[in-house]
């Protein structure tokens, strides 16, 4: 293991020891590293950039937070494969990471995400569950 990864694992251990929630930011971890981080206490991650990555994280037990902001727009690329695979979406959330004010004014905020999911064929109740409940 490299020193940076060892430091990540130590920070997870420290966070768990303080009875805090461990939120993930792990864009370049291998599957064994993901499994190790989940076993150490990580419970969410918002670094899946495609459907295969999102599905792998879900199958490993991670709560997947799909980014749909101004910089990262991963909703369609990540959610559609999850839906096509018939996977449970109770551990899927959509987050507006790095959403610029001008984009909120132009497109909307939560409503834009729900409209996007509806345009993908997601039933309204499931879109509401993914966006607001999960």
State where each predicted segment sits.
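Short, solvent-exposed amphipathic alpha-helical segments in soluble enzyme
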Residues: 7-9, 38-40, 80-84, 109-111
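Short, charged, surface-exposed secondary-structure boundary motifs
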Residues: 54-59, 75-78, 103-104
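Active-site glycine- and acidic-residue-rich loops that bind
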Residues: 28, 67-76
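Electropositive phosphate-/nucleotide-binding environments in soluble metabolic enzymes
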Residues: 2-9, 48-51, 72, 104-111, ...
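His/Asp/Glu-enriched, well-ordered alpha-helical/loop segment
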Residues: 17-20, 82-134
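Active-site neighborhood of phospho(di)ester-bond hydrolases with catalytic His/Asp-centered motifs
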Residues: 25-26, 45-46, 66-68, 94-96, ...
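Polyanionic/metal-chelating signatures
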Residues: 59, 63-71, 87-91, 105-107
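Hydrophobic, small-residue-rich alpha-helical packing segments that form membrane-like cores
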Residues: 1-63
């Amino acid at each position: 293991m490299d020193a940076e990864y060892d430091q990540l694992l130590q920070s997870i251990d420290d966070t768990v020891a303080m009875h805090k929630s461990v939120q993930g930011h792990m864009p370049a971890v291998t599957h064994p590293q993901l499994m190790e981080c989940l076993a150490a206490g990580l419970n969410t991650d918002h670094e899946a950039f495609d459907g295969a990555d999102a599905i792998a994280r879900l199958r490993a037990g991670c709560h997947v937070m799909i980014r749909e902001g101004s910089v990262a727009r991963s909703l369609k690329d990540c959610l559609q494969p999850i839906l096509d695979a018939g996977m449970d979406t109770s551990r899927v959330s959509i987050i507006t990471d790095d959403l610029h004010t001008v984009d909120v004014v132009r497109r909307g905020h939560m409503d834009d995400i729900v409209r996007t999911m509806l345009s993908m064929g997601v039933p309204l109740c499931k879109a509401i569950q993914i966006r607001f409940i999960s």
